[in-house]
Amino acid sequence: MTNKVNSYGWKALIGSAVGYGMDGFDLLILGFMLSAISADLNLTPAQGGSLVTWTLIGAVFGGILFGALSDKYGRVRVLTWTILLFAVFTGLCAIAQGYWDLLIYRTIAGIGLGGEFGIGMALAAEAWPARHRAKAASYVALGWQVGVLGAALLTPLLLPHIGWRGMFLVGIFPAFVAWFLRSHLHEPEIFTQKQTALSTQSSFTDKLRSFQLLIKDKATSKISLGIVVLTSVQNFGYYGIMIWLPNFLSKQLGFSLTKSGLWTAVTVCGMMAGIWIFGQLADRIGRKPSFLLFQLGAVISIVVYSQLTDPDIMLLAGAFLGMFVNGMLGGYGALMAEAYPTEARATAQNVLFNIGRAVGGFGPVVVGSVVLAYSFQTAIALLAIIYVIDMLATIFLIPELKGKALD
């Protein structure tokens, strides 16, 4: 494969990034709309929170299901299924009449969302040359942050005028854009070649092959364990910080809603910078050194941030915190693409990342418990420990795969 990125590579990347951006946009607008939905449908706080929980549960299930299907039937084909599933059931959310039908619609929409990350990462990795593979993964990862930023900017402007039902309809728009972009794509060459070679497989065992390849031998099992640790820390730290910090800044430091929103925007911009930098760095110095550098940066920035008390400094420092805590999101796509063969690549991306997402869901609970028992500063400082564990996993479990030819 040439080192030059062709037009197909760019189309595959943009189609993947828009889909992942839809994921971030959808989850954040749901958070913004919870109070309005709860008031309109007379939901309890527990019922309102469960709409988010079941969206994530659906995403985990969808990630595993569609990852395996895309390794068998194709990246582009299955991404079409996921986007249609999301669009239909997000549209149905706009006409929900009560808690139970809305919960069902959100869960099924979440199943559609779950396939976006892993399949999109696999598609971009297979469409881009090895020399630029980490950059491609980081650009797809940036899609999530662009979606989050778009939701943070649009929801306060539109929600008062069109209501939560209208916002669900707005949430379908990125899905149509992603569908249009993908409708002009064919399957990656490496996938079609591998599919032809495996076309004679039809037994039940062969259909489970993509899962078996994640633990096919000791070396691969070791990598899979390491990636689960990395993605768990990634999601645990992200949700632990992003769910609680705005609340802390508002209640303890008197940040207004506008200033809390500004902190979110500054922090997300830092995350975007970190993801971009990680992709550039990983293609230059390697995946493993880049992870270790950002993990060390996360430890230092978390410890320093936990000691800050000046509101203005905390506002600006959020960018550096976000850069190191979330910048590593730009590396998982390339790492997993290089660690697993074509017939298991999307399965690996979705299964391993969604296991991490499931573990990360406990982040807000753990941080909240420590806040109640001690203080917010203590809770944030303790998060540094998980990044030390992250470093150990990288050192002992993750090999350097920079430039590896995909098989």
Curated annotation (Swiss-Prot):
It is found in: Cell inner membrane. PROSITE patterns: MFS. Its main location: membrane. The keyword Signal does not apply. Residues 38-48, 99-107, 160, 246-261, 310-312 are periplasmic. Residues 1-16, 70-77, 129-138, 182-224, 283-288, 334-357, 400-407 are cytoplasmic. It comes from Haemophilus influenzae (strain ATCC 51907 / DSM 11121 / KW20 / Rd). Belongs to the major facilitator superfamily. Aromatic acid:H(+) symporter (AAHS) (TC 2.A.1.15) family. This is Putative metabolite transport protein HI_1104. SUPFAM superfamilies: MFS general substrate transporter. One of its GO terms (cellular component) is plasma membrane. Keywords: Cell inner membrane, Cell membrane, Membrane, Transmembrane, Transmembrane helix, Transport. GO terms for molecular function: carboxylic acid transmembrane transporter activity. The chain crosses the membrane at residues 17-37, 49-69, 78-98, 108-128, 139-159, 161-181, 225-245, 262-282, 289-309, 313-333, 358-378, 379-399.
